[in-house]
Swiss-Prot record:
Disulfide bond annotation, renumbered to this chain: none
Catalytic reactions on record: dTMP + ATP = dTDP + ADP
Species of origin: Nitrosomonas eutropha (strain DSM 101675 / C91 / Nm57)
Entry keywords, A to Z: ATP-binding, Kinase, Nucleotide biosynthesis, Nucleotide-binding, Transferase
The protein, known as: Thymidylate kinase
Family assignment from sequence similarity: Belongs to the thymidylate kinase family.
NCBIfam families: DTMP_kinase
InterPro entries: P-loop_NTPase (IPR027417), Thymidylate_kin-like_dom (IPR039430), Thymidylate_kinase (IPR018094)
Enzyme class: transferase
Length: 215
């Protein structure tokens, strides 16, 4: 049995990840693949409890506490969902993964990258996504989308400056890991974003096929 592939979607709140993630899942299922859709934090019983705690706007917490809870949820996510699915040949698509910690806890909260790297190695033991699609949108557009969509959570209540730091951290990660992270302009129309994402996914798909991966 061939190991499956792990794809992550990243972006600040309001970037449109969820909409495009659903499309990609359908695209891959149409090709006969088993596809597991997950999210962070969450996707396990404990992870969903931690998600509620982390997003609760009534619950203030230290940046390091937030970081440790994120990585605790991630360890459960890996152990209970991601790794078992990949081992049986399924493809896993996650709404956020570790790049989000470097962006939100690192860029946004100011947690040093060195500490995040230690946690990343401890929790993931060298594991990383096969492909990451980062949907980049200006903070002004992000805020407009979030405010019109739902009641704000603890992160969404942060000021614009916080999200600008998060966005810049994401862009820096995209430069640092350009082979894995593909940037899509999320400020374009839905159709234009979809077209750009399809191009990214199809290139990845073709690369897997040419390397001998049996679809």
């Amino acid at each position: 049995m061939q190991r499956g592939k792990f794809i992550t979607f990243e972006g600040i709140d309001g970037a449109g990840k969820s909409t495009h993630l659903a499309w990609l899942a359908s695209f891959l299922r149409d090709k006969g693949l088993e596809v597991i859709v997950t999210r962070e934090p969450g996707s396990t019983a404990l992870g969903e409890q931690l998600r509620q705690l982390l997003l609760d706007h009534r619950q203030a917490m230290h940046a390091e506490t937030e970081t440790l809870l994120m990585f605790a949820a991630r360890r459960e996510h890996l152990d209970k969902v991601i790794l078992p699915a990949l081992e049986r040949g399924a493809w896993v698509i996650s709404d956020r993964f570790t790049d989000a910690s470097f962006a939100y806890q690192g860029g946004g909260r100011g947690v040093p990258s060195a500490r995040l790297e230690i946690l990343e190695q401890w929790v993931q033991k060298g594991f990383s996504p096969d492909l990451t699609v980062y949907f980049d949108v200006p903070v002004t557009i992000s805020r407009q989308r979030v405010q019109s969509a739902r009641t704000a959570d603890r992160f969404e209540l942060e000021p614009d400056l916080f999200f600008e730091r998060v966005r810049q951290a994401y862009l820096q990660r995209a430069k640092q890991f350009s082979e894995r992270i593909r940037v899509v302009d999320g400020s374009l129309s839905l159709e234009e974003v979809r077209t750009a994402m399809v191009e990214v996914v199809e290139k990845f798909w073709s690369a897997q096929a040419s390397s001998g991966y049996r679809m």
